[in-house]
From Swiss-Prot:
It comes from the Bacteria. Mg(2+) binds at D454, D460, E463, E464. The gene is pheT. Residues 401-476 form the B5 domain. This is Phenylalanine--tRNA ligase beta subunit. Residues 701-794 form the FDX-ACB domain. Belongs to the phenylalanyl-tRNA synthetase beta subunit family. Type 1 subfamily.
């Protein structure tokens, strides 16, 4: 927001420099982005009056003038401006004046005619105003007055950045209020008399959406002269705040917006078919806006309408059909309180952003509308004349915001600030902020002001006290606390260890947004509802992720589109699962996910390129699990998932509970996501594997180990892991290792069956095993496999 320093100082004028004022504003939390002078550096320019104006005898585009600058005689000045004429009040640079760029004014002759000065335009004085010709000053401008004094040009435009919670400072009144509080100065609110009604005209209002518009005011002003020029002081104040002058009606509403922070609008009364309705848009309605564009309205948009249809998008943009123009005689002024949630995001969905919507979506003082209406009426009648009707107001108290009641404990205040502030000082600060305060038993009971939507909790009050007390007034003290050693169990597994292992395995870590495209997510999780954001950054980031795969696969596509065919990525983060049983209706789970695509190894002359498959990623996952305490407990059970290949996917099970999934991306899903080649993915709950197996040191056996290889035939549906688990369960402690080293299907093996080659390592720590001992272990294993899986030895 931009504002004029001199305008703020009309309200409150602390005895400090511009630099000090800007520093003070920044420390209040209203960060100053820049300060610019409102005019260039010049001197010797005064208010003049063109007494005579005649055509130059030797130049068609020049005029010879005599100008009164309040001296002993009239000055002869040659001027080329097309708007130069007799009786005009002008900005006259006299002999010796210095204009921006160190341009000095001297007596000279132009085409043979003497010229003792220069009639200046805005641009020649370094003033940013779009105009052609010289400056036209009001007729009551006093001749001979220094122009810098007359237009208050020794002023600065200050630009500040506001956080969304400080909508109360989007006005001169709000900024002045803050400066007054910190300097302990009273704010000089401009005095104006309420305009009494002189006509009986009223407007019938129908409030059909009170939850979106709890308060709505209209007022008729008839016989308005919209051709009247806006006074120079009004134009200058608008200009210094970054708004150009348009016509007196628009200028007045913009002035109220800047001064009080209340957006207003004016309708041409002749173009409004009463009653005026405040309602939600209907499907199929359209509105031609003031800029000539047509908005196709959505049913979530609040409208101002009449009997013939929409008049304006409430709080955002007016309609062309009901707008004020040069032929307008009677107007209807509007001031309203629109609920922030009814306006937030609506302007963006139509590609709009206005000063009005910027304020309404952050929150406008809900007690300001009548004051703003009175102030605007007074200014309008002063500038344009007119006859005024009564203010017509419709309000719904049930939907108006309620003032927040907040308790602040002395203990909490001291703990957060680390400094004790006297009770009287705290009470004084809160009172000066416009809050209602009472104190008893070391607790302040505070009622927020109507303009402070952001005062909701105890910490908000602590922040306010710290701002006004001054951060620099809080002494620096080293924290005093009892330190405790961080408890770290030997069984705890650090996530960084897993990340390092994945990086060592040629993966790269990715960090993607938690907000994802719902269309992409529906490809991966078609049967699962996601948490949809009501006010997203964009349509492509409007849903919370159900898994990390949406972001990771998007990263794979990004790399493939840039000729990176071999991609291995992993990510850790939260996924968000809608759950009515969880807090706030969403379950947040921390997971580890990885994807791989392309060749198994980088291109090399000694080897043939092979594409990755399910078992490559499974092997990497098993390597990760080997660092945890769950490696021998985790099982991979065949299971189908909508986005995965039905023959190449599995659930990751731990103690009978599914903790993740792994598989090859379904070709149809890969096509929809724009991916090339085979892509393999996994995702697993981190907390389920976040412990590691504590190493148990054992003496190496002095006795020889014995290996026995078995080739057993089982049904094709039997999982090899189940076979290995069965061996471990029945063989006893002498079976130290069991491994699968070959799988065969073909000649010699019945159809629908497969041959599993497994090795048994049998060893005793107490003695050398005899052949009978070894055969006994093998016999027990074969018997169990036959009973459980109907397995038999392959011939």
């Amino acid at each position: 927001m931009k504002f004029s320093e001199s305008w703020v100082r009309e309200w409150v004028n602390p005895a400090i420099s511009t630099a000090q004022l800007c520093d003070q504003i920044t420390m209040l939390g209203l960060e100053v982005d820049g300060v610019e002078k409102v005019a260039g550096d010049f001197s010797g320019v005064v208010v003049g009056e063109v007494v005579e104006c005649a055509q130059h005898p030797d130049a068609d585009k020049l005029r010879v003038t005599k100008v009164n600058v309040g001296g002993d005689r009239l000055l002869d000045i040659v001027c080329g401006a097309p708007n130069c004429r007799q009786g005009l009040k002008v900005a006259c640079a006299t002999e010796g004046a210095v204009l921006p760029g160190d341009f000095k004014i001297k007596k000279t002759k132009l085409r043979g005619q003497p010229s003792e000065g220069m009639l200046c335009s805005f641009s020649e004085l370094g003033i940013d105003v779009e105009s052609s010709g010289i400056i036209e000053l009001p007729q009551n401008a006093p001749v001979g007055t220094n122009l810098r004094d007359y237009l208050t040009l020794d002023d600065n435009t200050v630009e500040i950045s506001l956080t969304p919670n400080r909508a109360d400072c989007l006005s001169i009144a709000g900024i002045a209020r803050e400066i007054g509080v910190v300097n302990k100065l009273a704010v000089n609110t401009p005095h104006f008399e309420s305009v009494k009604a002189t006509i009986t005209d009223k407007v019938d209002i129908q409030l059909h959406a009170p939850e979106a518009c709890p308060r709505y005011l209209l007022r008729v002003v008839k016989n308005v002269n919209v051709q009247a020029p806006s006074p120079m002081w009004l134009q200058e104040k608008l200009r210094r705040c970054g708004i150009r002058s348009i016509d007196p009606v628009v200028d007045v509403t913009n002035y109220i917006l800047l001064e009080l922070g209340q957006p207003m609008h004016a309708f041409d009364a002749a173009k409004v078919a009463q009653p005026v309705q405040v309602r939600m848009a209907k499907s199929g309605e359209a509105l031609v806006l003031l800029d000539g564009s047509t908005a196709k309205l959505k049913d979530n948009t609040l409208l101002i309408a009449d009997q013939n249809g929409p008049l304006a998008m409430a709080g955002i943009f007016g309609g062309q059909a009901s707008g004020v123009n040069a032929e307008t005689k009677d107007i209807i002024l509007e001031a309203a309180f629109f609920a922030p949630l009814a306006i937030a995001g609506r302007a963006r969905q139509y590609g709009l952003h206005t000063d009005s919507s910027h304020r309404f979506e952050r929150g406008v003082d809900f007690e300001l509308q009548r004051q703003a209406m009175e102030r605007a009426t007074a200014l309008l009648v002063e500038i344009c004349g007119g006859e005024v009707g009564d203010i017509c107001e419709v309000a719904s108290d049930a939907f108006l915001p309620k003032l927040n009641q907040v308790s602040l404990r002395r203990e909490k205040l001291d703990a957060l600030l680390g400094h004790h502030i006297e009770t009287e000082t705290v009470t004084d600060i809160l009172t000066r902020l416009g809050l209602q305060v009472s104190y008893a038993n070391d607790v302040w009971q505070v009622t927020s002001a109507s303009w402070r939507f952001d005062i909701e909790i105890e910490e908000d009050l602590v922040e306010e006290i710290a701002r006004i007390y001054g951060y620099n007034s809080i002494p620096n003290k080293a924290p005093l606390a009892h330190l405790r050693m961080r408890e770290h169990k030997e069984a705890d597994l650090d996530l960084a260890r897993i990340k390092t292992a994945l990086v060592d395995a040629d993966y790269q870590e990715a960090i993607t947004y938690s907000f994802v495209d719902p269309k992409i997510q529906s490809v991966l999780h078609p049967q699962q509802d996601a948490l949809v954001l009501p006010n997203p950054i964009s349509v492509e980031m409007s849903a919370m992720r159900l898994s990390l795969l949406s972001g990771l696969l998007g990263a794979v596509q990004y790399n493939q589109n840039r000729q990176q065919t071999r991609v291995r990525l992993f990510e850790t983060g939260l996924r968000f699962i809608p759950d009515t049983q969880a807090e706030f209706g969403v379950r947040q789970e921390f997971v580890l996910a990885a994807v791989m695509t392309g060749n198994k190894k980088a291109e090399h002359w000694a080897g043939k390129a092979e594409s990755v498959d399910f078992f490559d990623l499974k092997g990497d996952l098993e390597s990760i699990l080997s660092l945890t305490g769950t490696r021998n407990l985790v099982k991979f059970v065949a299971k189908s998932y909508p986005a995965l290949h039905p023959g190449q996917s599995a659930a990751i099970m731990l103690n009978g509970e599914e903790i993740g999934f792994i598989g090859t991306l379904h070709p149809n899903a890969a096509k929809q996501l724009g991916l090339n080649g085979k892509t393999v993915v996994f995702e697993i709950l981190w907390q389920a594997i976040a412990t590691r197996q504590v190493v148990q040191a054992k003496e190496i056996s002095r006795f020889p180990a014995n290996r026995r290889d078995l080739a057993i035939v089982v049904a094709e549906s039997v999982a090899a892991s189940d076979v290995l688990d069965a061996c471990r369960e029945v063989a006893g402690e002498t079976l130290t290792q069991v491994n699968l080293f070959d799988v065969y299907q073909g000649n010699g093996v019945a159809e629908g069956h497969k041959s599993l080659a497994i090795s048994l390592i049998i060893q005793d720590n107490e003695k050398t095993l005899e052949e009978d001992d070894i055969n006994a272990v093998v016999s027990v294993v074969l018997s169990e496999l036959k009973q459980r899986f109907n397995a038999y030895l392959r011939d």
